[in-house]
Design a protein with these regions (language model features):
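Internal alpha/beta scaffold segment
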Residues: 1-16
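Arginine residue identity/basic-tract feature
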Residues: 3, 20-21, 35, 89
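Short, conserved secondary-structure transition motifs
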Residues: 14-32
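A generic alpha-helix structural signal
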Residues: 1-4, 23, 83, 96-97
Length: 116
């Protein structure tokens, strides 16, 4: 680490990879999405071609909710955490899947599923 001082290199933990994942918007199965989410909710809809012929799950994908979306959030005064409710005009519109303090932004960041 002595050699890295000129480059402002510091030690860190594996937790820093989680922060970078959130900053980059890289999803983690089991944290940001699970078997109850559909590809459209978590930003993977561009990989689904509903105009193709038959494929397993197509009928279900034609009827799923496309009004919930995963968004990155930046919080001014708090560090968000999993399950944090998101309000708009006193109504719950979503919840946070993951959160952390971002040294890059100097603020709390997270990913949230929000009903639009």
């Amino acid at each position: 680490m002595e050699r890295g001082k000129d480059f402002n290199i510091k030690t860190s933990s594996l937790d820093s990879m989680g922060i970078r994942r959130i900053e980059a918007g890289i999803l983690d199965y089991g944290t940001d999405m699970n078997r109850f989410n559909n590809p459209f909710e978590v930003g993977l809809g561009k990989f689904i071609d509903l105009s193709k012929g038959f494929f397993i799950g197509k009928d279900k994908l034609l009827t799923v909710n496309k009004k919930t979306k995963l968004f990155g959030i930046i919080c001014q005064n708090i560090i968000p955490f999993s399950g944090l409710k998101i309000f708009y005009k006193n109504k719950i519109v979503g919840q946070t899947t993951v959160g952390a303090f971002s040294p890059y932004f100097g603020k709390g960041i997270g990913l949230s599923l929000i009903h639009i």
